């Protein structure tokens, strides 16, 4: 009887222990499941609802970046992103950025990215390339600097210093005076954090690519060097925005060059005055400069703007026969009238002047009404 009571008491005493152990196991199971679930979610599950682009600047810390990402309204679970950032050493327990862990750059977050992928992307600098577009009129170095700096992390001063750095430019075969020829307007795939050296490398590669064996032969046939092609092309580029006319304009200037005539190109006068003139007058033609093609025969010492491929192709493939002159069309549509003789040129010039006078009178009458 006493043995049965002892056994019963033992069972009674062991029951709470079993319950405790079982409860601990259940809690541990659910805790492991909870932690494991969070780890799985952080590493494997998409935590973003849409695509977004972010730019990380050198002076930004991870809190700034976190705020930038959250502002895009694409984060499903902020806690998941914070955990991933902390695990990758980007975020400490006090929400302070990890030292030297965050990589500046342009990043793209997509809807299939996990929190861990984004954290590693930021830590390892897995940037998305950007398209740097160089287009339009570029008559000043400051314009080139502004166009590049607006699309890259570098500032305009960095670009300007490079365009003035003769030692740097000499590595590419150019000088600060003729650097316009180095730039080839186009769309380039670059990384937002690329240095100015990388940009210049790409320009030189594009420049070299243009100068095929066939184009070199065409230049020699015109009696021009590569730089002289760029120089004449820059004048053509400044003369008109109507690309189909480029070969005709180039033809006129080449004819004048071959006959020993002065180019008398208005854009070279504009260049002498840093393109600040609204209208070129006779007094402006007396400006003493090697770039003044009214005063000096031949080509200017260097390009007066970034010429571009269309104008360079026009110089290599001119049209227009024996034309030696051209003037603006009286239709005011941006085109020109071409002539082989001075007398025909005067007729065209008078027609334009007559149309211009009539246009100005009409404008004055409208203002009076």
Where are these regions (language model features)?
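N-terminal Lys/Arg-rich, disordered targeting/topogenic segments
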Residues: 1-15
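A general, composition-driven signal for non-globular sequence regions
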Residues: 2-5, 32, 231, 253
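Hydrophobic, aromatic-rich alpha-helical transmembrane segments
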Residues: 15-19, 345
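Signal peptide-directed extracytoplasmic domains
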Residues: 38-210
């Amino acid at each position: 009887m006493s043995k049965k009571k002892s056994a019963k008491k033992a069972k009674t005493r062991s029951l709470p222990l079993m319950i405790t152990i079982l409860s601990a196991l259940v809690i541990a199971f659910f805790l492991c499941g909870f932690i494991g679930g969070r780890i799985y979610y952080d590493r494997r599950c998409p935590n973003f609802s849409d695509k977004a682009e972010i730019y990380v600047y050198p002076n930004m810390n991870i809190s700034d970046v976190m705020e930038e990402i959250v502002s895009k309204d694409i984060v499903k679970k902020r806690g998941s992103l914070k955990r991933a950032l902390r695990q990758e050493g980007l975020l400490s327990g006090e929400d302070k950025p990890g030292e030297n862990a965050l990589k500046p750059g342009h990043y793209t977050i997509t809807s299939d990215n996990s929190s861990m992928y984004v954290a590693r992307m930021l830590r390892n600098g897995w940037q998305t390339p950007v398209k740097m577009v160089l287009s339009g009129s570029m008559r000043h170095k400051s314009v080139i600097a502004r166009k590049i700096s607006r699309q890259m992390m570098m500032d305009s001063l960095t670009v300007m210093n490079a365009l003035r750095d003769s030692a740097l430019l000499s590595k590419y075969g150019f000088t600060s005076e003729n650097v316009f020829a180095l730039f080839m307007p186009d769309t380039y795939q670059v990384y937002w954090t690329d240095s100015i050296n990388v940009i210049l490398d790409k320009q030189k590669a594009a420049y070299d690519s243009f100068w095929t064996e066939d184009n070199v032969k065409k230049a020699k046939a015109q009696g021009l060097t590569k730089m002289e092609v760029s120089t004449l092309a820059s004048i053509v580029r400044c003369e008109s925005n109507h690309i189909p006319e480029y070969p005709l304009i180039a033809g006129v200037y080449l004819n004048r060059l071959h006959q020993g005539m002065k180019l008398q190109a208005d854009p070279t006068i504009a260049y002498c005055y840093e393109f600040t003139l609204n209208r070129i007058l006779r007094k402006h033609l007396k400006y003493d400069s090697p770039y003044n093609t009214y005063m000096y025969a031949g080509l200017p010492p260097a390009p007066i703007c970034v010429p571009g491929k269309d104008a360079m192709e026009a110089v290599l493939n001119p049209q227009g026969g024996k034309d030696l002159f051209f003037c603006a069309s009286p239709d005011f549509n941006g085109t020109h009238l071409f002539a082989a003789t001075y007398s025909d040129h005067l007729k065209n010039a008078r027609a334009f002047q007559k149309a211009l006078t009539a246009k100005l009178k009409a404008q004055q009458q409208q203002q009076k009404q």
